[in-house]
Design a protein with these regions (language model features):
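Extreme N-terminal starter segment of soluble prokaryotic enzymes
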Residues: 1-3
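Acetyl-CoA-dependent GNAT
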Residues: 5-93, 98, 111-112, 117, ...
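Conserved residues at the C-terminal ends of beta-strands
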Residues: 82, 129, 154
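Conserved acetyl-CoA-binding loop-helix of GNAT-fold acetyltransferases
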Residues: 97, 103-116, 141, 145
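Conserved beta-strand-loop-alpha-helix junction that forms the acyl-donor binding cleft
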Residues: 102, 127-139, 157-160
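Short coil/turn segments at alpha/beta junctions that flank glycine-rich nucleotide-binding fingerprints
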Residues: 104, 121-124
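Conserved active-site alpha-helix within GNAT-family acetyltransferase domains
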Residues: 108, 124, 132-152
């Protein structure tokens, strides 16, 4: 596996990979949890949201960076990180690994790469967020194995 900087030619592959990675979360967890009406209101355009968001992830002038993991000639995953808005702080904003490359240390190596890059830029505190659902269990285990501390935060939504 090789980790390298993002190039513009990666963009469509990363968009597709992001949608592939998170489709089960939205279709099999969020949609049944929220029901049709609330899901459509909150996340009905989730694929388009990623199509709009992924192109903004890499902006070195703003301190936002992306690194890509390759296995052979295939993109196996990517990580995006950015400043968090607090002094000396950053965050891993998104980590996506293709289904065919999971459980092969790709996510771990991408996270370590992002942390190392942030440290080199003077960051002393790194945050990362994820869901507390079954879909994100592997991500939580990874982050905890990297020394991150889980902070109990709950979010609620109600139609009124």
């Amino acid at each position: 596996m090789r980790i390298r900087p993002f190039t513009d030619s990666d963009l469509q592959t990363l968009i597709d990979l992001t949608i592939e990675t998170f489709r089960p979360f939205y279709e099999h967890y969020v949609h049944p949890l929220l029901g049709d009406e609330v899901f459509q209101h909150q996340h009905g355009q989730w694929e388009q949201d990623y199509r709009d968001d992924v192109p903004t992830l890499h902006d070195p002038i703003a301190g936002r960076r992306v690194a890509v993991a390759e296995v052979g000639d295939a993109i196996a995953g990517y990580v995006a990180w950015r400043p968090s808005g607090k002094p000396n702080s950053g965050e891993v904003y998104i980590l996506a690994v293709s289904s065919s490359h999971r459980r092969q240390d790709v996510g771990r190596q991408l996270c370590l790469h992002a942390i190392d890059q942030m440290r080199a830029d003077g960051v002393r505190f790194v945050g990362i967020g994820t869901g507390d659902d079954a879909f994100h269990a592997a991500a939580r285990a990874l982050y905890e194995s990297l020394g991150f501390t889980k902070i109990p935060i709950a979010g609620y939504l109600k139609k009124v």
